[in-house]
């Protein structure tokens, strides 16, 4: 029962209704709490005890070290397997000069330090959205400080949700933040920021297709050194077999792989660093000259255009860097910085230096191919081969998990058709799995592996995804610095100039080879972007149509007071995307079926641009006039990482907070202005002896729905005098009984049954629309809608309790 659950949460609440400057004291045993301003009489906004701010709070060093160890297993595997294919792709046409090896090594060292360590680990991680990273989190952070969302469903109450403005509002004197906000809220800027976000998202998903192919194929290629009779076809089919098994086990919740096999990645990084030191000492210590950036200049002087083109292969050094930022949610910034600085950086640099030393003595093409496995001492080949396969799979896991999470986030933005999202762990809310996404990732990865057959072509496609995501991240990071961070403008200029200039050079080198592979991820990204744009465009148009055609209050009153309208027992939950007003489908329902339930609640499921919304701040209510008709509007707010409850659980929570609202609404309507304060500790005894001073009116320790106001008359000792005192206040016993009666009515109708009413709106283009709009709306969108999951499945609504109402909108 909802009332019983309400009682479990806390049976008493102190309500203070005051005029002017009057006030009152709390009981001696109570810790006084500051009053909370009520937003308006007909809106419930309950400020509960707020959870602690910050990502992980104050961490102990032991916790940081433990998180750092797990971080190695989940985030560093992809970066740790890049040495498998960097040199063999960079020098695939041979080494022209022995100092070219030192030049490329110098590029690798400074590129890795600049982009992985400086940009991501020490700068970008601080631009997280309450512990979530990636371009999606940057967009969410921007949308909290500027109205860049294309759907007009923002509400003033949203900004009061915990963690909505964790970074603090920029001071009014900070002119650049105000200027940036005004520029971003212009329509062209909104579209541009949205375009960049979904473009980066589409590229990241395309990268999730390419990454498993490159990593696993590079690892399996090492077999040719010990089994030279293996053909390319056999290597490809072995790779495909591993990929199929890898994607097949995703449904079991393989985020656990990262935790279980963190020791595997640690052993891998330790071994490759040890082998790198061994090769350095054995072959050529002189490659340490690569720490002198002069060799980069000499390299470009010697190779000119060819050296510039080879930059595309050098950026493979930091593939997987985006995972450090995107998968921040499980870890703290300190743990990632610690593990990256003291484990990842030295291990990766040692193996690149060791391979360079080996290649200085073995410059022929035979040794350049599979340079990594050739540089390994013979007794360690098989252990390293097995570790390479395992580490590659673990590295792919982080990317695939990112794809599942990204698709879930896209749905909260209404940028992608509804697909099935499963939670594979009850303990970790971020462990997601989507059968549809997993199938297409597996299919495309296998097709790409079978089509290109070698890493050379796939790597070129991989490069374009990496560098474009880097460029977009730099742009969004700069916007965050200007809008949110209180940083000196010259530091922002330095950040933008340094990273945008260097990344543009890398991008130009990759685009030069456009016809040799990079078109593939752009083609995949283009298809994804068309789907995202069409779905979001029609969704925005449909929302605006409903907003323009909301039912007026007079029309609602007229509908509810119709003589032929029948009220049947039970509660009707009417789902709508509209957060303002009554949707136009409501009068359509009454015209077709002039019968509604005794209690009607219009529910709008809304996702805020923050990861999580506490359940105590989830619901906003407003009662629709006339009040005796018991019709309410409710906005249920979720973060983009929050899980939607099962239908029955949702109803239980909804009814609990609806009863709170009924109680508070009646109390708030007694006097104006109103203040509400919540005691910081629970009180189990009545304290009605103190009288309010001046014009203050008190109803202290009001009972929650679980307890009856009529129970007050059952206390024999001294209760009659206290009731007499209470009846002199403005909140009379009759009014309190009215509150109880309304609450009991709600619970009684819930017991009579709950029916879920869903509007099934079909959208078509207006007859006079142009051909492109007709194709987009009538064909592409409706095809996507018919092949996506139905709303009742997304909300876990039982079919026996479902009522659908069909309507057609012309947009």
Swiss-Prot record:
Keyword ATP-binding recorded: no
Organism: Oryza sativa subsp. japonica
Transmembrane helix is among the record's keywords: yes
Record protein name field: Probable potassium transporter 16
This protein's GO CC annotations: membrane
Protein topology in the membrane: Multi-pass membrane protein
Annotated PANTHER family: OSMOTIC STRESS POTASSIUM TRANSPORTER, POTASSIUM TRANSPORTER 16-RELATED
A Pfam family this chain is assigned to: K_trans
């Amino acid at each position: 029962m909802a009332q019983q659950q309400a009682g479990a949460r806390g049976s008493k609440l102190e309500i203070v209704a005051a005029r002017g400057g009057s006030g009152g004291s709390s009981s001696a045993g109570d810790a006084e709490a500051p009053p909370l301003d009520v937003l308006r009489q007909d809106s419930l906004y309950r400020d509960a005890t707020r959870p602690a701010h910050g990502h992980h709070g104050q961490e102990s060093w032991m916790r940081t070290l433990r998180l750092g160890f797990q971080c190695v297993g989940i985030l560093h595997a992809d970066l740790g397997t890049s040495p498998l294919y960097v040199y063999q792709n960079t020098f695939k046409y041979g080494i022209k000069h022995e100092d070219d090896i030192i030049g490329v090594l110098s590029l690798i060292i400074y590129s890795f330090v600049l982009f992985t360590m400086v940009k991501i680990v020490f700068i970008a991680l601080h631009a997280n959205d309450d512990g979530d990273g990636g371009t999606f989190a940057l967009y969410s952070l921007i949308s909290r400080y500027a109205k860049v969302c294309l759907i007009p469903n923002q509400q003033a109450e949203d900004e009061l949700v915990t963690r909505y403005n964790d970074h603090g509002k920029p001071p009014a004197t900070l002119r650049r933040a105000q200027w940036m906000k005004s520029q971003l809220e212009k329509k062209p800027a909104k579209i541009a920021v949205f375009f960049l976000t979904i473009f980066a998202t589409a590229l990241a998903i395309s990268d999730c297709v390419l990454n498993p192919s490159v990593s696993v194929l590079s690892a399996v290629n090492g077999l040719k050194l010990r089994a030279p009779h293996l053909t390319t076809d056999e290597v490809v089919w072995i790779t495909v077999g591993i990929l199929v098994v890898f994607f097949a086990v995703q449904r079991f919740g393989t985020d656990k792989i990262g935790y279980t096999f963190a020791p595997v990645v640690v052993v891998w990084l330790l071994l490759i660093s040890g082998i790198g030191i061994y090769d350095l000492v054995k072959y050529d210590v002189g490659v340490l000259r690569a720490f002198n950036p002069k060799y980069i200049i000499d390299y470009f002087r010697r190779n000119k255009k060819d050296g510039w083109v080879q930059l595309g292969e050098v950026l493979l050094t930091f593939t997987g860097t985006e995972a450090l930022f995107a998968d921040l949610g499980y870890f703290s910034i300190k743990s990632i910085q610690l593990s990256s600085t003291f484990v990842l950086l030295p291990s990766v640099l040692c193996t690149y230096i060791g391979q360079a030393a080996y290649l200085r003595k073995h410059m022929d093409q035979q040794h350049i191919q599979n340079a990594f496995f050739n540089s390994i001492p013979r007794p360690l080949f098989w252990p390293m081969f097995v570790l390479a396969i395992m580490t590659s799979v673990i590295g792919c896991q982080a990317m695939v998990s990112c794809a599942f999470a990204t698709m879930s986030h896209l749905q909260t933005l209404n940028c992608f058709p509804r697909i099935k999202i499963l939670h594979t762990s009850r303990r970790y809310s971020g462990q997601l799995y989507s059968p549809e996404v997993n199938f297409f990732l597996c299919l495309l990865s296998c097709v790409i592996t079978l089509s290109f057959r070698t890493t050379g072509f796939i790597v070129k496609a991989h490069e374009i995804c990496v560098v474009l995501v880097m460029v977009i991240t730099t742009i969004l990071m700069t916007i965050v610095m200007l809008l949110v961070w209180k940083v000196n403008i010259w530091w922002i200029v330095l950040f933008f100039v340094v990273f945008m200039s260097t990344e543009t050079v890398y991008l130009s080198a990759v685009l030069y080879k456009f016809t040799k592979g990079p078109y593939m991820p752009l083609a995949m990204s283009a298809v994804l972007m068309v789907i995202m744009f069409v779905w979001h465009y029609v969704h925005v148009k449909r929302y605006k149509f409903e907003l323009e055609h909301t039912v007026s209050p007079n029309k609602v009153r007229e509908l509810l007071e119709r003589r032929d309208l029948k009220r049947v027992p039970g509660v009707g939950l009417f789902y709508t995307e509209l957060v303002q007003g009554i949707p136009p489908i409501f009068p359509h329902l009454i015209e077709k079926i002039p019968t509604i339930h005794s209690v009607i609640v219009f529910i709008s499921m809304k996702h805020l641009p923050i990861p999580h919304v506490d359940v105590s701040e989830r619901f906003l209510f407003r009662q629709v006039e006339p009040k005796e008709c018991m019709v309410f509007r409710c906005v249920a707010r979720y973060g983009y990482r929050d899980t939607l409850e099962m239908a029955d659980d949702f109803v239980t929570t909804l009814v609990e907070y609806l009863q709170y609202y009924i109680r508070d609404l009646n109390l708030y309507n007694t006097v104006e202005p109103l203040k509400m304060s919540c005691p910081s500790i629970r009180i189990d005894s009545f304290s009605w002896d103190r009288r309010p001073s001046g014009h203050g009116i008190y109803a202290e320790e009001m009972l929650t729905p679980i307890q009856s106001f009529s129970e007050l008359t059952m206390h024999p000792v001294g209760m009659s005098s206290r009731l007499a005192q209470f009846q002199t206040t403005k909140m009379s016993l009759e009014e309190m009984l009215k509150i109880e009666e309304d609450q009991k009515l709600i619970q009684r109708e819930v017991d009579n049954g709950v029916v879920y009413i869903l509007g099934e709106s079909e959208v078509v283009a207006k007859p006079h629309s142009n051909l492109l709009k007709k194709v987009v709306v009538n064909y592409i969108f409706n095809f996507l809608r018919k092949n996506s999951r139905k709303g009742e499945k997304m909300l876990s609504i039982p079919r026996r309790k479902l009522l659908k109402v069909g309507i057609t909108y012309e947009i």
